[in-house]
Amino acid sequence: MAQVINEMDVPSHSFVFHGTGERYFLICVVNVLLTIITLGIYLPWALMKCKRYLYANMEVNGQRFSYGITGGNVFFSCLVFVFFYFAILMTVSADMPLIGCVLTLSLLVLLIFMAAKGLRYQALMTSLNGVRFSFNCSMKGVWWVTFFLPILMAIGMGTVFFISTKMLHANSSSSVIVSVVLMAIVGIVSIGIFNGTLYSLVMSFLWSNTSFGIHRFKVKLDTAYCIKYAILAFLALLPFLAVAGYIIFDQILNAYDSSVYANDDIENLQQFMEMQRKMIIAQLIYYFGIAVSTSYLTVSLRNHFMSNLSLNDGRIRFRSTLTYHGMLYRMCALVVISGITGGLAYPLLKIWMIDWQAKNTYLLGDLDDLPLINKEEQPDKGFLASISRGIMPSLPFL
C-alpha cells in the first residue's frame, strides 16, 4: 500500500510518440528504392534513417530522444560481415570445410565481444535532453551471462531429462502414457526455468551496467516470477499444439488409407486438396498459438521489468500497463496484414504498435530534479570497436 501511495504522490509522465505512419511509410519506400538502386550499399543508411526517425519522435517528460548514428558509422562494420559471409561460402563451395569452420568459429567468438561493444556505442550515441546514455560492463560478465551460463544450464537440464528417462518404465500401455506425461512436465518446467532464469539474469546484468549521464539504472527482477510466466506461456501454447497435431495426425492416417483403398484419380485429387486445406488450418492454429504464447510472455515480463527498473537510487521509477489482448491483436495484425499486403502495411502497423507501447509506458518522477550531467566518455576507438558498430543490439526503450 505504501508503494502505491508513493507512486501516486510523484508526477507521472507517459511516453509520447509523435511520428505518423504515413511519414514512416514514405521513409521506408524511399529506403527500399535506394537500397535496390545501389545494390544494397545504401542499406546501413536506410536502417539508421529509420531508427533516427523513431527516436526523434519519442518524447518523455517534455524532452525527445536523439540518436546520432549514421549509415557511415556502421558501413565499415557491415563490409566486414559481408566479407566473412562470402569467405565462408567460398570455402564451403571450394570443398574446404575445415577453413570454413575456422572462419565461422572465429566470427562466433568475436560476436559476443562485438555485441557488448556495439551496445556501448549505441548507448553513447543516444541522448535525452542532451544527456547521453552509457553502457559499461566487464567482458567476463558478458561471457558468463550470454555464453557459459546458457551452456551450463542446457547441460544440466539435458542431464535431468536423461536421468528422468532412465527412471521411467514402459512395461505396459498405462505406464507408457504416464511416462509420456511425466516427461512432458519435466520438459515444460525445464524450458520455463531456462527461459525465465536467463531473462532475469541477462536483463539485470544489462541494466545494472547502464547509466543516464552520471546516474545509474538499477533493476532487481524476481527470477521465480519470470520462471512462472515462462511456464504459463508455454502451457498456453499446448492446446493449440494439441489441436494442430491431431489434425495433422488424422490427415496422415487418411492419406495412408487413401493410398491403400482409393483407385479413382479424381477421388485422389479431391482427397489431396482436402488434406492440403486441413494442413493449412493446422498451421494457422499453430501460428495463432505462438502469437498467444508470445504476447502473454512479452507483456508479463515487460510489465514486471518496468515496475522494477529505477534510476538514481529509486528517485525515478517506471511502469508499464500493456495488456495481453492489446499485444495479441496488434501482433497478429502486424504479421497477417503485412503478409497480405506484401509488406506495404508494415510501416503503418509498426508505428501503431510503437504508439500504443509508448502510451502505456510511464516515467514516475521528474528528470528535471536530477543533475543532468554527462559522463566524460567517448566512443571506443580501434579496429575491433569500429567493426562492432554494425552489431546493433539495443537495450529496451533505448
Curated annotation (Swiss-Prot):
It comes from the Bacteria. One of its GO terms (cellular component) is plasma membrane. Its main location: membrane. Residues 46-73, 117-142, 197-228, 300-333 are periplasmic. It is a multi-pass membrane protein. InterPro entries: DUF898 (IPR010295). It is found in: Cell inner membrane. Residues 1-24, 95, 164-175, 250-278, 355-398 are cytoplasmic. The chain crosses the membrane at residues 25-45, 74-94, 96-116, 143-163, 176-196, 229-249, 279-299, 334-354. Keywords: Cell inner membrane, Cell membrane, Membrane, Transmembrane, Transmembrane helix. This is Inner membrane protein YjgN. It comes from Escherichia coli O157:H7.
